[in-house]
Amino acid sequence: MPFRFGTQPRRFPVEGGDSSIGLEPGLSSSATCNGKEMSPTRQLRRCPGSHCLTITDVPITVYAAMRKPPAQSSKEMHPK
């Protein structure tokens, strides 16, 4: 059966990393890849359609910092 968008609830990172509460069926907090266990310090997880690779246990502040545009210097803001 092909993967359809909107068939599963969205998950968003929680402050301090992903919570093990409310995981979708079939996903576990101990991710495996090609039969090998991943490092407990950095876990990778693929979405159900295998389109994206997610790094778990990343604080929300990291995602917020990635979305901000680079700050401009005061010279660029007030040219003479």
From Swiss-Prot:
Belongs to the FAM229 family. This is Protein FAM229B. It comes from the Eukaryota. It comes from Bos taurus. Residues 1-44 are annotated as: Disordered.
